[in-house]
């Protein structure tokens, strides 16, 4: 009897690449012994619902789209009692998590990894009652991904995120915060903060720290303190471009859990999508909670 696969895909992700590759991708799955049920998402949040309601009776769930689509599929799986391995065929404009896992950019090669690769257990982030895969962030740049028009993302790729972020510099605001982690309390005004489990964010590698492991139960945390003048802002941008993750205004550390409190509700982004306004959040690592298909050579 053939193995059963639920294939959830976003037909609009990236440059709608899935349209020209869909039949070949499904053919790859079928030749590997899977009976495939294809489900094109119709609206934001649709993939969460599809996985929760339809996963029963399947051996694997595969998704194709950007990081947002993967986030929805993982969220649906993590909220289910029975968890299945997940395959990922990237089709977005910036696929940070796929890059960290060395999943090929070629959709057909990624489909081959789904059926011929190996299963890797990696960490998943909890954000209050929500779930994220590789980044939770606030402040400057955090609304760039969901605030950048889809057409711009498609044409410019991850350069679109940097362009949009730089455009917003004149209106930068800071946030008075209290951050509790590792038995310490950090207080101050911050321009930006990100809690990551990835080798890259926004398509830029090396800005999340050194020796990053996706299955060690630890987040890499980066905080950028409030600059006092335009020169400080330039120095911060230069440090990020040069991948100097520790400087006068940039504070980094690792932790498995932290609490972030602000004086008023603050906008967060989860995996590049709007994560809501929150005044108090607890972020913790769900150690090796996600089983995902990766190439054999991925360590």
Where do the protein language model's features map onto the residues?
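ATP/NTP phosphate-donor binding region
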Residues: 1-64, 299
